[in-house]
Amino acid sequence: MTVPSAFRGAMRLPAIAAPMFLVSGPTLVAETCKAGVAGTFPALNARTPDELDAWLGTLNADLAAARAADPAAAVAPYGINLILHASNPRVAPDLELICKHKVPFVITSLGQPGEVVKAVHAYGGLVFSDVIHAYHARKAAAAGVDGIIAVASGAGGHAGTQNAFSLVREIREFWNGTL
């Protein structure tokens, strides 16, 4: 991937550990980040907004302590996956918490990322968008995302049906940013 400038020097490997439903949580994410890989989890893994608030507070404290203990260490940023589909009643409260805790990056899925981009960019965070087709990538790019995640055939979760090589090639025809 083309590494965003905000991530340079903070990662040992230019990779994002996937936000795995019911698997990824604050402990896994913190340890992943301490190993120099960007860790993520789905917002909905925290079963309530109160739990999400606690998780984000814990993550920020754990990673700040790791950076303070070894300033030379590559402690990667963490991110959160926010499902934007209309069936998710927690989009607004979760986005509020994301902004409160200034989550370094947000991965949007299953919806238009425009409002998330505005909110997250307001505090200096980055927004990446999951896409399964070049059509969706164009919409995400137009919304101002900082990166596009090509979810191709064989990916976990809400996978697309297109081959990764052809999907990336199609997106690269118009997108020069982080992919």
Positions of PLM-derived features:
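Active-site entrance/lid segments in N-terminal catalytic domains of soluble metabolic enzymes
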Residues: M1-T178
